[in-house]
UniProtKB/Swiss-Prot annotation:
Keywords: Cytoplasm, DNA-binding, Transcription, Transcription regulation. GO terms for biological process: regulation of DNA-templated transcription. It holds the Pfam family TACO1_YebC_N. InterPro entries: Integrase-like_N, TACO1_YebC-like_2nd/3rd_dom, TACO1_YebC_N, Transcrip_reg_TACO1-like, Transcrip_reg_TACO1-like_dom3, Transcrip_reg_TACO1_YeeN, YebC-like. This is Probable transcriptional regulatory protein SAOUHSC_00675. One of its GO terms (cellular component) is cytosol. It is found in: Cytoplasm. Its main location: cytoplasm. Belongs to the TACO1 family. YeeN subfamily. One of its GO terms (molecular function) is DNA binding.
Amino acid sequence: MGRKWNNIKEKKAQKDKNTSRIYAKFGKEIYVAAKSGEPNPESNQALRLVLERAKTYSVPNHIIEKAIDKAKGAGDENFDHLRYEGFGPSGSMLIVDALTNNVNRTASDVRAAFGKNGGNMGVSGSVAYMFDHVATFGIEGKSVDEILETLMEQDVDVNDVIDDNGLTIVYAEPDQFAVVQDALRAAGVEEFKVAEFEMLPQTDIELSEADQVTFEKLIDALEDLEDVQNVFHNVDLK
């Protein structure tokens, strides 16, 4: 695999200036996960995975507790998971994941964001085949060889382990998220810099300076939408 985890790096780099937006998105996702089963991460795997991801973004406990309490109590909102696919300038491709209580509103908003920023909505499947769905972990303080040895000793299969500027990145199948994380914890990993699900492009592209400006405006417009949870793309942003 060996590709950079650009989408996650960009999201984390923006955390300080977009803290409230990221926290709001996690609050919604935690509520949906808690409402889908028991509001207890010990018995609700979906909730556990969301909370593990939230830790890497330092989501405050009061936001987590508020979302879970809402799911326990009078919260009666129902949300749908939606995925949109589209194109930006010069062969750029985007996947937009949303969580919404109004499908028509979200579809209209996403289509408008594409149309006003040099992009076009595609049909389902027009882009996703160029991406791989993976669980991504980032670990400091342990080398690629150490992580590989740990995983082999515990008979845990992963897709790839690479070094990215001193951060060891582990790619695994999405359904192995908890298995891989538990194995790494058992080997002494106490903190994950990254613990995410990602749509990873099979090939990255580079854009001209002008196209990159347009593309970044498109990304910002999509991520600013209330219903959008994640935007993945195939552009190597400089």
